[in-house]
């Protein structure tokens, strides 16, 4: 009975503190907040298969005083968010992933949507955008390894092309073919930018034209050039690529400044993730005393990201049985910590980073009921 009263007092104290704390903060318009969140970590970094961004939006206008952070949005977590007067829930995992054909009270995910809309609470999910971000989940996971240098295993592409257009077209025009007239005609095509420079080929003065153009404009450019066989025969068409980003991407390949034993690395990981147990598969020929210099890691489910990466150790939340066997056969040890255990601890760092990024304009709180559904007993 006494313990129940203590828990009630503690819960009441937290709620009172939350209300006092939130009253000291101002509000942000939802659209302005979403723009700031995208500035913090662009949604363009997310994988193409993912469902990220604003998933549930109350009718506008909608202002946010309290941003509620959770790894998984369950019904228990939703109840907590409502009790704490959340205006927007940032759920790392998207609670809406597969399309919904109806919104009824039948399934728990449908009920989440209903309760959010009834209580004017938005739901936002960054998921793999935060996996890829330089200050994101995987970088946080790497902090537990010790002093190391790291790089993405699969670098992300920049969200934009460094120049206008998706293609470059180059061809030469002789001075007898009136370069100015050709340039003028090309500039009339929407989505084309033209540069030119002089060149001499086979003792003939020429103007080398270079165009950057969109995919749609490319068809019109080719149609124009094909009208003049001399142009068309000397044409080169290049497909432009978005550059890879140095510090952004999926997974991390971490090289320790100093090698440590596998046993030491296990203890570091358990300490960082606040876990008493992890699952270990020893690589063929390896022991707990084997040195670890290179660690490949991926928060959550890492099979597809880690596969084929040369390392002493794989660290992730979960992998399939056969992928573990495959890694072990190559002498790579594997540590599995359960899916969300490799992600949830990041939220504390995220709260501090968002407080600074948003200039302390709103109240940001962490879920106290969010937890991994699996327990070792």
Swiss-Prot record:
UniProt-recorded name of the protein: NIF3-like protein 1
Species name: Bos taurus (Bovine)
Native organism taxonomy: Eukaryota, Metazoa, Chordata, Craniata, Vertebrata
Principal subcellular localization: cytoplasm
Key word Phosphoprotein present: yes
Localization in the cell: Cytoplasm; Nucleus
GO biological process: negative regulation of transcription by RNA polymerase II; neuron differentiation
Region feature (Mediates interaction with COPS2): 244-377
NCBIfam families: YbgI_SA1388 (TIGR00486)
Family listed: Belongs to the GTP cyclohydrolase I type 2/NIF3 family.
Family annotation (Pfam families): DUF34_NIF3
């Amino acid at each position: 009975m006494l313990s129940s009263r203590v828990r009630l007092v503690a819960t009441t104290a937290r709620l009172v503190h939350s209300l006092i704390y939130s009253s000291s903060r101002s509000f942000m318009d939802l659209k302005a907040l979403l723009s700031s969140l995208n500035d913090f970590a662009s949604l363009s970094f997310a994988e193409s298969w993912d469902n990220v961004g604003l998933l549930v939006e109350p009718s506008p206008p909608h202002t946010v005083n309290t941003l509620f952070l959770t790894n998984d949005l369950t019904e228990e977590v939703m109840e907590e968010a409502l009790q704490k007067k959340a205006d927007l829930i940032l759920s790392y995992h998207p609670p809406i992933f597969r399309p919904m054909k109806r919104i009824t009270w039948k399934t728990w995910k449908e009920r989440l949507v209903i309760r959010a809309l009834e209580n004017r609470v938005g739901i936002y999910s960054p998921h793999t955008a935060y996996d890829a971000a330089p200050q994101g989940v995987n970088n946080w996971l790497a902090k537990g390894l010790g002093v190391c240098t790291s790089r993405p295993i699969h670098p992300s592409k920049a969200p934009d092309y460094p120049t206008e257009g998706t293609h470059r077209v180059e061809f030469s025009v002789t001075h007898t073919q009136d370069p100015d007239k050709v340039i003028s005609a090309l500039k009339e095509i929407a989505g084309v930018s033209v540069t030119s420079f002089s060149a001499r080929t086979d003792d003939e003065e020429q103007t080398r034209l270079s165009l950057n153009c969109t995919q749609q404009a490319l068809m019109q450019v080719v149609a124009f050039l094909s009208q003049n066989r001399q142009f068309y025969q000397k044409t080169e068409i290049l497909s432009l690529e978005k550059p890879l980003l140095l510090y952004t991407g999926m997974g991390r390949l971490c090289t320790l400044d100093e090698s440590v034993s596998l046993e030491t690395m296990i203890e570091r990981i358990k300490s960082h993730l606040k876990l008493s147990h992890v699952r270990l598969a020893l690589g063929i020929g390896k022991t707990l005393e084997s040195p670890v210099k290179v660690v490949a890691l991926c928060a959550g489910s890492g099979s597809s990201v880690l596969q084929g990466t040369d390392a002493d150790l794989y660290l992730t939340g979960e992998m399939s049985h056969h992928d573990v066997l495959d890694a072990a056969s190559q002498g790579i040890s594997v540590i599995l910590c359960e899916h969300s255990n490799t992600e949830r601890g990041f939220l504390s760092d995220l709260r501090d980073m968002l407080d600074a990024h948003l200039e302390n304009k709103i109240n940001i709180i962490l879920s106290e009921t969010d937890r991994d559904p699996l327990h070792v007993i």
